[in-house]
């Protein structure tokens, strides 16, 4: 017999996890599906050591601790959580949707898509020597600060992630250099101020032209000054962290038998977070609407909107109050 749910949440990152919690507050029978082996999405997979500053009420928290707290929050309700299961198809039927994963099928009244930017992969450094150094001296994330203890580190990139990584590495590394191809950084003004007040050496405007291993197991990074035909420089580092951003792939959506309207690989949603397909809602970094900000905090705000909209539309007899102080977790 096919298991039936009120709400199916696809994607177990911060926004999807909070949507599951809020659905639990409404006593909705809910399943949370995550393709990775554990919950947490990109935060847990790529930025567990990153200090997160934009969650209300928390002066600072790293990604690992944030996801741990959200996992604990979910234990208040009898939610069905399935990790390591990728959704391969969604089909509409007379009572809602059939959700197919690589482990089987379930039935659901409504869906909340919270897959962020979909499948993500780092934008690679495409210069001579980069491929051979990848996974050794050249990395694309900082999952463990201890791996950089007392090392000479270069971070390449000019956005928030690059600045965050440079500042995060400063207390543990022997030295940190932040390399950017422009004179100005794209990060938030506060983070740029913290950067300039730190001991991180800022090197602009330079591009990486080539990397090569040294006899001592380090990496020689050859740089070219932007705007100059001849000016070059070399720097020997223990680790090169490339932070050029991530490419996204919504192949999960493309394989479904329903057509979700997308703009620039982002899902268009209404003010109730509903997509172009009635009964399917979307939240988090993978959606777009006027004024949208791609922040964890924004996803936390979108989750209750989507859940409340579903309860109002499909379960009006038990939509419940809208304030958490009026909602009681199941014992």
Swiss-Prot record:
Assigned keywords, A-Z: FAD, Flavoprotein, NADP, Oxidoreductase
A family per Pfam: Pyr_redox_2
Catalytic activity: 2 reduced [2Fe-2S]-[ferredoxin] + NADP(+) + H(+) = 2 oxidized [2Fe-2S]-[ferredoxin] + NADPH
UniProt entry tagged with the keyword Signal: no
Gene3D superfamilies (alphabetical): FAD/NAD(P)-binding domain
Needed cofactors: FAD
Single Gene Ontology MF annotation: ferredoxin-NADP+ reductase activity
Residues that coordinate or bind FAD: 34, 42, 47, 87, 120, 285, 325
Free-text remark on how the cofactor is bound: Binds 1 FAD per subunit.
EC primary class: oxidoreductase
EC assignment: 1.18.1.2
Subunit structure: Homodimer.
Family to which this protein belongs: Belongs to the ferredoxin--NADP reductase type 2 family.
Protein name: Ferredoxin--NADP reductase
Native source species: Levilactobacillus brevis (strain ATCC 367 / BCRC 12310 / CIP 105137 / JCM 1170 / LMG 11437 / NCIMB 947 / NCTC 947)
């Amino acid at each position: 017999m096919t298991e039936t749910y009120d709400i199916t949440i696809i994607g177990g990152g911060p926004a999807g996890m909070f949507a599951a919690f809020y659905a639990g507050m409404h006593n909705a029978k809910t399943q949370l599906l995550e393709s990775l082996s554990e919950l947490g999405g990109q935060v847990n997979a790529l930025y567990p050591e990153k200090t997160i500053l934009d969650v209300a009420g928390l002066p600072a928290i790293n990604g690992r601790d944030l996801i741990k707290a959200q996992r604990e929050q979910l234990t208040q309700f009898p939610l069905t959580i399935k990790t390591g299961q990728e959704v391969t198809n969604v089909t509409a039927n007379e009572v809602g949707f059939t959700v197919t994963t690589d482990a089987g099928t379930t039935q659901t009244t409504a869906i909340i898509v919270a897959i962020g930017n979909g499948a993500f992969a780092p934008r690679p450094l495409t210069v001579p020597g980069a491929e051979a150094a990848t996974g050794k001296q050249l990395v694309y994330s900082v999952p463990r600060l201890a791996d950089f203890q007392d090392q000479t580190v270069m971070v390449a990139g000019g956005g928030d992630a690059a600045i965050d990584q440079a500042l995060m590495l400063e207390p543990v590394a022997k030295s940190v250099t932040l390399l950017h191809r422009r004179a100005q950084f794209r990060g938030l003004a506060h983070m740029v101020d913290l950067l300039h007040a730190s001991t991180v050496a800022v090197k602009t405007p330079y591009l990486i032209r080539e990397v090569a291993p040294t006899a001592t197991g380090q990496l020689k990074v050859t740089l070219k000054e932007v705007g100059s035909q001849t000016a070059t420089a070399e720097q020997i580092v223990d680790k090169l962290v490339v932070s050029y951003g991530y490419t996204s792939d919504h192949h999960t959506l493309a394989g479904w038998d329903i057509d979700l309207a997308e703009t620039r690989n982002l899902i268009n949603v209404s003010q109730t977070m509903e997509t172009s397909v009635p009964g399917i809602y979307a939240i988090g970094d993978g959606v777009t609407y006027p004024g949208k900000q791609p922040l964890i905090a924004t996803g936390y705000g979108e989750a209750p909107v989507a859940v409340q909209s579903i309860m109002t539309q499909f379960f009006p007899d038990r939509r419940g109050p809208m304030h958490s102080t009026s909602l009681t977790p199941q014992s």
